[in-house]
C-alpha cells in the first residue's frame, strides 16, 4: 500500500473541490481514507492514504487524455 494521487486512465488525476468526494473515491478503491489536496503539484486533486498497490496512481509525466 502507499499514499498517492489516485489516477484515472492516461495518468490523469481526479480533480476535486471537496474532501468528501475524495474520501469516498479512495475508500471505494480500498484506501484507508482520502482528501482533496488543494494547490498541489497537479492542481486540486484527490490524495489517498494506504491505497492498495493494484490501484493506478499518478506517475511522472503528463496526463494523456485523448
Swiss-Prot record:
<feature type="disulfide bond">
    <location>
        <begin position="26"/>
        <end position="48"/>
    </location>
</feature>
<keyword id="KW-0738">Voltage-gated sodium channel impairing toxin</keyword>
<dbReference type="Pfam" id="PF00537">
    <property type="entry name" value="Toxin_3"/>
</dbReference>
<feature type="disulfide bond">
    <location>
        <begin position="22"/>
        <end position="46"/>
    </location>
</feature>
<dbReference type="GO" id="GO:0019871">
    <property type="term" value="F:sodium channel inhibitor activity"/>
</dbReference>
<feature type="domain" description="LCN-type CS-alpha/beta">
    <location>
        <begin position="2"/>
        <end position="64"/>
    </location>
</feature>
<dbReference type="InterPro" id="IPR036574">
    <property type="entry name" value="Scorpion_toxin-like_sf"/>
</dbReference>
<comment type="function">
    <text>Alpha toxins bind voltage-independently at site-3 of sodium channels (Nav) and inhibit the inactivation of the activated channels, thereby blocking neuronal transmission.</text>
</comment>
<dbReference type="InterPro" id="IPR018218">
    <property type="entry name" value="Scorpion_toxinL"/>
</dbReference>
<dbReference type="GO" id="GO:0005576">
    <property type="term" value="C:extracellular region"/>
</dbReference>
<keyword id="KW-0800">Toxin</keyword>
<dbReference type="InterPro" id="IPR002061">
    <property type="entry name" value="Scorpion_toxinL/defensin"/>
</dbReference>
<keyword id="KW-1015">Disulfide bond</keyword>
<dbReference type="InterPro" id="IPR044062">
    <property type="entry name" value="LCN-type_CS_alpha_beta_dom"/>
</dbReference>
<comment type="similarity">
    <text>Belongs to the long (4 C-C) scorpion toxin superfamily. Sodium channel inhibitor family. Alpha subfamily.</text>
</comment>
<dbReference type="GO" id="GO:0006952">
    <property type="term" value="P:defense response"/>
</dbReference>
<protein>
    <recommendedName>
        <fullName>Toxin Boma6b</fullName>
    </recommendedName>
</protein>
<dbReference type="InterPro" id="IPR003614">
    <property type="entry name" value="Scorpion_toxin-like"/>
</dbReference>
<keyword id="KW-0528">Neurotoxin</keyword>
<keyword id="KW-0872">Ion channel impairing toxin</keyword>
<dbReference type="GO" id="GO:0090729">
    <property type="term" value="F:toxin activity"/>
</dbReference>
<keyword id="KW-0964">Secreted</keyword>
<feature type="disulfide bond">
    <location>
        <begin position="12"/>
        <end position="63"/>
    </location>
</feature>
<feature type="disulfide bond">
    <location>
        <begin position="16"/>
        <end position="36"/>
    </location>
</feature>
Amino acid at each position: 500500500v502507499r499514499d498517492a494521487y489516485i489516477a484515472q486512465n492516461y495518468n490523469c488525476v481526479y480533480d476535486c473541490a471537496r474532501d468528501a468526494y475524495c474520501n469516498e473515491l479512495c475508500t471505494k478503491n480500498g484506501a484507508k481514507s482520502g482528501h482533496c489536496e488543494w494547490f498541489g503539484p497537479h492542481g486540486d486533486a484527490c490524495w489517498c492514504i494506504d491505497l492498495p498497490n493494484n490501484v493506478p496512481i499518478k506517475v511522472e509525466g503528463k496526463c494523456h487524455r485523448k
